[in-house]
Amino acid sequence: MSETNKRHRAGFVNIIGNPNVGKSTLMNTLVGEKLSIVTAKAQTTRHRIMGIVNGDDYQIVYSDTPGILKPNYRLQQSMMNFVDTAIGDADIILYVTDTVEKGDKNDEYIAKLQKIDCPVILVINKIDISSQQQVLELMNWWKEQLPKAIIFPASAQEKFNLDNIFDAIVDNLPVAPAWYDKDVFTDKNLRFFASEIVREKIFLNYKDEVPYSCEVEIEEFKEGTERYDISAVIYVMRDTQKGIIIGKAGQALKKVGTQARIEMEDFFQKKVFLRLFVKVDPDWRESKKELRRFGYEY
């Protein structure tokens, strides 16, 4: 092994925690790219998404995961499978909580972290909306739950204390060669990001159960010299939801399409021609066949 390889560190840093604590915002900020969609609604993230940060002597493979929940249907069970896999193959666990919650509702996962062999870095996010006393109380509570964890108060939104978190990650990476080529920044392809961008706009523009009843599939993705031609199907579970997604005279769907196209053009750095369609599939959240088609695992 060369001297360079002896010094090189690389590993998988898997981000887990409850819904809506800022896991996706944290990963996007650490990676420097918007790879995970972000909304104010819980359970926005459904897949495990990797973001890779490279330096001369390190490679960090971040992995954003769905928020921990008790599954009510097969889609959510698949989401929790992503979380369990992430715990099992981590070199470092980045457990994210915030100043709004206490983690005692996650007894099962806290017990797993107490027994795990790899380093655990615990991030108490959103300290910008809390008092110093509240943050200190939470830090002490978490020290009792996870005595071996490295604990950081932070604000992913305000980028507070992220440099120290980054340094702790690099210091705790195993000595290893890079897992991916140094010019790779994610494991997902452009079709995946196109579908996620559309899904984000659905979460931002509709309320109640509608966003949770939708899935987006890219049926066509053609790269031309000047633009991408993309056709996406939004699957819903009921005819009434289809009507809500389309809206009066198609205006709601048009708004989603415009917002998605603008973000795709910024992300892909190329013009986009986007077509959206809406179809009804009552069983997609429970059908193993459909879930596999949409990229979920069993």
Question: What function would you assign to each model-found segment?
Answer:
Residues 64, 125, 155:
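Active-site glycine-centered loops adjacent to acidic/histidine catalytic or metal-binding residues
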Residues 57, 81-149, 222-224:
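Conserved C-terminal guanine-recognition region of P-loop GTPase G domains, centered on the G4
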Residues 45, 68-70, 102-103, 130-131, ...:
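Catalytic P-loop NTPase motifs of RecA-like helicase/translocase cores
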